[in-house]
Amino acid sequence: MTFSALPFRRADRRRLLAAALAACALTLTAACDSGTVTVPVTDSVTTSAVADPRFAELETTSGARLGVFAVDTGSGRTVAHRADERFPMASTFKGLACGALLREHPLSTGYFDQVIHYSAAELVEYSPVTETRVETGMTVRELCDAAITVSDNTAGNQLLKLLGGPEGFTASLRSLGDATSRLDRWETDLNTAIPGDERDTTTPAALAADYRALVVGDVLGAPERDQLKAWLVANTTGATRIRAGLPADWTVGDKTGSPAYGSALDVAVAWPPGRAPIVIAVLSTKSEQDAEPDNALLAEATRVVVDALG
């Protein structure tokens, strides 16, 4: 079965956003679809987290603004630094987009086996997989694989279309209970990361909570949760970020982002042997537009997280 990925009509997007806001944004718990999820996106939640002075020292030595939120889902212990400040979302949205589609369309429906067709005119910068598949199209499953494992930007845009664009994607976050994160633009415009610009931003606490809900919580059914985990574990773009700061025997799934202003972003779920998962979001950005991202900063911040959580 084939179809073209066309955006939802404007009225449909408005209705979806309004419904999500009415149902979920006023409470920070959501019973939408399956499961109830509490999303720690407010100051009152993160004020109880451990604040480690080593994060401030890393900021001084790196010249970057650093945001961290991590939670041990077994003990409930958390570590935070600038956890409620806004940072660019960039390509970290791609894992959440696939999670939203899995939530709407269980694997048993066959939705992820449908072929999406797109034109060469829709290709954007850095699309290593989709640029080779213009003639054949790609299944939704293949688009998620490309968007998460190699961060293919055209694949990300096709997934956004299926959700009703940036507005529909944001509505899906609201239905999780995330009243903070927002996506306003498409790839690659969403990567400007201008300091003080709230478009296309999230916070470490909100981003970690969203990934926790989808990968560890009961928002998704077991088959869908396993599929999202498999895509994240297969990611090839994060070897020098959070993964580099974790013990070698931990299983790790993550999604990175690298927008302008030297921003280095990573959000991960890690499974230590014999322990409950740990969810970690480490986000950084700099003041110069053409600065280089500091992958080593994210790795070192992760080492601090592991030490602080014990």
From Swiss-Prot:
Swiss-Prot/TrEMBL site (Increases nucleophilicity of active site Ser) positions: K94
Entry-linked SUPFAM superfamilies: beta-lactamase/transpeptidase-like (SSF56601)
Signal peptide feature range: 1-31
Predominant localisation class: membrane
GO molecular function: beta-lactamase activity
Positions of S-diacylglycerol cysteine lipidation: C32
EC number assigned by the record: 3.5.2.6
One GO CC term, this protein: plasma membrane
Residues reported to bind substrate: S151, K255, T256, G257
The keyword Ribonucleoprotein is annotated on this UniProt entry: no
InterPro entries: Beta-lactam/transpept-like, Beta-lactam_cat, Beta-lactam_class-A, Beta-lactam_class-A_AS
Membrane topology term: Lipid-anchor
Example of a GO biological process term: beta-lactam antibiotic catabolic process
Keywords noted in UniProt: Antibiotic resistance, Cell membrane, Hydrolase, Lipoprotein, Membrane, Palmitate, Signal
Regulation: Inhibited by clavulanic acid.
List of catalytic residues: S91 (acyl-ester intermediate), E187 (proton acceptor)
Catalysis: reaction(s): a beta-lactam + H2O = a substituted beta-amino acid
Compartments where located: Cell membrane
S-S bonds: none
Recorded superkingdom: Bacteria
Residue positions bearing lipid (N-palmitoyl cysteine): C32
General function of this protein: Confers high levels of resistance to amoxicillin, benzylpenicillin, piperacillin, ticarcillin and cephalothin. Not active against ceftazidime, cefotaxime and aztreonam.
Additional information: The class A beta-lactamase family has a specific amino-acid numbering system, sometimes called Ambler or ABL numbering and often misspelt as Amber. A multiple sequence alignment was used to derive a consensus sequence and then the consensus was numbered taking into account insertions and deletions. This allows use of identical numbers, e.g. for active site residues, despite differences in protein length. UniProt always uses natural numbering of residues, hence there appear to be differences in numbering between this entry and some papers.
Family listed: Belongs to the class-A beta-lactamase family.
Descriptive protein name: Beta-lactamase AST-1
Species whose genome carries this gene: Nocardia asteroides
